[in-house]
Amino acid sequence: GLVQKECERVIGENDRIYSGQTAGFYLNQLEELVQKSKDLKYIEIAGVDNFPCFLYDEVTKEIQAQENLHTVLKAKKILEELGCFIQNVNAPSATCVHTLELMKQYPEITSAEPGHGFSGTTPYHVDHDAEEIPSVLYLSEVSHVLDNHAYIYGGGYYRRGHIQNALIGSSYEGLVKDSVILPDMDSIDYHFGLENPHHIGDSAVLC
């Protein structure tokens, strides 16, 4: 029969785990995991994974390895000592060319999800001219003006997207920059506010 290779998510006591992504095996559970996997003849433990292994530090303006990465590397060693052949060490988050350069310090890493690296939209790209050129935009238009603030249509807002500014206008030559007023975290993103009034129907470009 076909043997399915598995990549196990591993977690440590001090790892950063985002809400909604709670899952994985603690390091002290790996021996039991290996023993139980021996009863399943069509699977093979062949990889380890955790998220996020790298994050952008807005103070230092640099991408830094997280405790999660060290958990992954410890898990690889433990599983290999238990007889597993670990072929894939996946270390995702904030992946871009710059992060790949940092990964050279950890030769055990074999993969990382491309994610925002493809589109040049990691937090690193906000402060640096990196190899990737930002290629995703949020396009809307001014829906109304109230109390000297323009509002643009929302929908699909990624709350960790760090939107700060928008370009507003009806032509490329006439675009003006304005600050974005984001909805509260517990609100639906029907609209984004702008600091200043603008013409209803003008385009709004955000990134």
Predicted feature descriptions by range:
Residues 3-126:
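Active-site loop/helix belt of alpha/beta enzymes
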Residues 68, 131-133, 181-183:
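Short Gly/Pro-enriched turn/cap motifs at secondary-structure boundaries
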Residues 68-71, 172-176:
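Gly/Ser/Thr-rich active-site loops/lids in small-molecule metabolic enzymes
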Residues 95-175:
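Active-site loop ensemble at the mouth of alpha/beta enzyme cores that anchors a bound cofactor
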Residues 173-188:
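Short, basic/aromatic beta-hairpin or loop at an interaction surface
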Residues 187-196:
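Short alpha-helix capping/helix-loop boundary micro-motifs
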Residues 200-203:
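Loop/turn positions that initiate beta-strands
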